[in-house]
Amino acid sequence: MTRVVVIGSGFAGLWAALGAARRLDELAVPAGTVDVMVVSNKPFHDIRVRNYEADLSACRIPLGDVLGPAGVAHVTAEVTAIDADGRRVTTSTGASYSYDRLVLASGSHVVKPALPGLAEFGFDVDTYDGAVRLQQHLQGLAGGPLTSAAATVVVVGAGLTGIETACELPGRLHALFARGDGVTPRVVLIDHNPFVGSDMGLSARPVIEQALLDNGVETRTGVSVAAVSPGGVTLSSGERLAAATVVWCAGMRASRLTEQLPVARDRLGRLQVDDYLRVIGVPAMFAAGDVAAARMDDEHLSVMSCQHGRPMGRYAGCNVINDLFDQPLLALRIPWYVTVLDLGSAGAVYTEGWERKVVSQGAPAKTTKQSINTRRIYPPLNGSRADLLAAAAPRVQPRP
């Protein structure tokens, strides 16, 4: 039997698998001719972009609920090796699987430098498990002796994830530490750049800065973290901040599986792909999501985001089947780009274009953000094969 292996079950991986199943149906390929298999280290599709939120109950979807109805198999294991010449992947269990075509969609991870104490005492919201660990840690602090350090969180990295995390935390801390003991919850956002939201542009920056003020978030810019301890952080300036919680949100890098391929990668570790999501220089391999640097238009490459990962997955899934059956491949182009950043109780900010011009802010932008986070980025959850495959069509959604 011919086999398509998809590595990863995040936004790109899920939609690549469903996109492949949809295209097989569309071509009326007889059942049992092509096996579509997802290999990932968890039996879940995680809504990773919501990990900064206080309520994580809707952030994890059993893969069986969305792959099963589509006839897509799933293997719960971490892929440890890719043999591109032999067209075979090996997993942490020792099992190996041959493939006729491969879609690499193993995502990205937060970069944690070798700072003293970071690995031992730092937290993150990079994964669902990491977000749960942070949640449990904060709940544990709230049940213990109430000190200023216990009620203080330092967030490192003032990019999008760091800003959303910092803006969400004041509400969480006030709910957890509302015991009337005279201790005021404190959130401090740190970044080595001279200002927060360095990638958000001049239009959005004042909105973000005001939101941080409104949320009571302190900032330290132009400094970096030198060391982390159970009691806080030491900054490059020499300042020490007493805090029982340090959340690391600084920097992302593509899955280490990209390092196994004999081709060039960009500064984020991403593979170069062509307009059809084929990995340039590696036969029979496609890539989608955070592991791939795909051209969105004549000037811009894809951004590590579900905004780009989902359509990249859909197109890769369609094209991997087209490639198997000598059908024309579909070029992916996304003619627009938006950013909708959650600012906690201050609402949100919505920007359009690569220059990130603000078009909405406050409560209206918050409504859009909530719609994205709770509906737009989810697969159909009604168990309908028809609905799942229809949602996997190779198309680009309109602006939210």
From Swiss-Prot:
Q: What EC number(s) are associated with this protein in UniProt?
A: 1.6.-.-
Gene Ontology terms, MF aspect: NAD(P)H dehydrogenase (quinone) activity
**Keywords assigned by UniProt?**
FAD, Flavoprotein, Oxidoreductase
The residue stretches assigned to a coiled coil in this entry are: none
InterPro entries, per the entry: FAD/NAD-bd_sf, FAD/NAD-binding_dom, NADH-Q_oxidoreductase
The UniProt induction remark is: A member of the dormancy regulon. Induced in response to reduced oxygen tension (hypoxia) and low levels of nitric oxide (NO).
EC top class, as a word: oxidoreductase
The record's free-text note on cofactor binding: Binds 1 FAD per subunit.
Q: What cofactor does this protein call for?
A: FAD
Q: What is this protein called?
A: NADH dehydrogenase-like protein MT1860
Source organism (scientific name): Mycobacterium tuberculosis (strain CDC 1551 / Oshkosh)
